[in-house]
């Protein structure tokens, strides 16, 4: 699924350099997954070992924020640039979609639209969560653990439930082709089915742990992921076919950059969505446009 950006502004890159930038790597993909899931399991284990103490609260908060950064895994595997292997891209795409409460069919199509109409109001870019005018209560609730419960009717979980019971939502109607909608509903039912199994397990074992590990992290550990996401397009121009005005590149420390899988180079990503994230810093170097530094939206 290639995104047609012919009508968008694109900075020039030498063809040979661009070819090298687009090279995928199974090694880079597995390295990232090993460190990510290794860190997740480590803090999950520490939370379990200290269960019942205040240390458990701290470790679960860290676990939840790492877990919620599965958004970056979903994104990179969705672009099929995390691995050279199609199988491993699809395998981790399904896992990270569940972790992120993203129904995989809906989000593949809405992300395709996001790249074709970035920050547009018409046709609506459904991936822009914070729009103007901003609902301040909703905005600040995104940063507070369990604040999202106040707006559960707007949550991705509620959207998945609607799809699972056969309701055609606005995003389904505008983004997903008719022939793909049954796939969306079926995968939504799988997600809801897993949620039910986890909830029933918590009830049977009389323990919050299954839910704290698999369902609730996006409610109590979403702070970092929301902060990362806000750097992309919030407060910038809408309805303009130039990513330099609608998208933002920022600079992060190495830990945050890893968790975000280098999507802080977001202008570069939108201009060249086929470049794997591990090469995005190089794409910044290779872009050869004299006026670029003056024109581009950096922070």
What label would you give each PLM region?
Residues 296-299:
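Hydrophobic alpha-helical segments, chiefly the membrane-spanning helices
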């Amino acid at each position: 699924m290639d995104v047609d950006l012919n009508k968008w502004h694109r900075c020039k890159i030498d063809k040979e350099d661009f070819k090298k930038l687009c090279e995928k790597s199974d090694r880079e993909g597995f390295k990232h997954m090993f460190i990510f899931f290794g860190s997740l399991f480590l803090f999950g284990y520490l939370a379990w070992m200290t269960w019942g103490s205040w240390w458990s609260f701290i470790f679960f908060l860290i676990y939840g924020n790492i877990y919620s950064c599965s958004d970056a895994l979903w994104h990179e595997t969705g672009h099929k640039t995390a691995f050279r292997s199609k199988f491993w891209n699809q395998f981790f795409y399904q896992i990270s979609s569940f972790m992120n409460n993203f129904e995989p069919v809906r989000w593949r199509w809405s992300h395709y639209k996001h790249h074709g109409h970035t920050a547009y109001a018409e046709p609506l870019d459904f991936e822009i969560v914070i729009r103007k005018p901003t609902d301040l209560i909703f905005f600040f609730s995104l940063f507070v653990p369990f604040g999202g419960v106040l707006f559960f009717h707007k949550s991705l979980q509620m959207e998945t439930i609607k799809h699972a019971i056969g309701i055609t939502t606005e995003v389904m109607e505008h983004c997903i082709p008719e022939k793909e909608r049954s796939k969306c509903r079926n995968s939504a039912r799988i997600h809801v089915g897993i949620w039910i199994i986890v909830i029933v397990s918590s009830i049977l074992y009389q323990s919050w742990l299954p839910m704290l590990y698999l369902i609730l992290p996006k409610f109590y550990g979403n702070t970092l992921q929301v902060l990362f996401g806000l750097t992309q397009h919030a407060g910038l121009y809408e309805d303009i076919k130039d990513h330099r005005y609608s998208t933002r590149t920022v600079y992060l420390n190495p830990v945050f950059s890893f968790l975000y899988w280098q999507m802080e180079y977001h202008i570069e990503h939108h201009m060249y969505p086929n470049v794997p994230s591990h090469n995005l810093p190089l794409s910044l170097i290779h872009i050869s446009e004299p006026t670029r530094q003056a024109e581009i939206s950096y922070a």
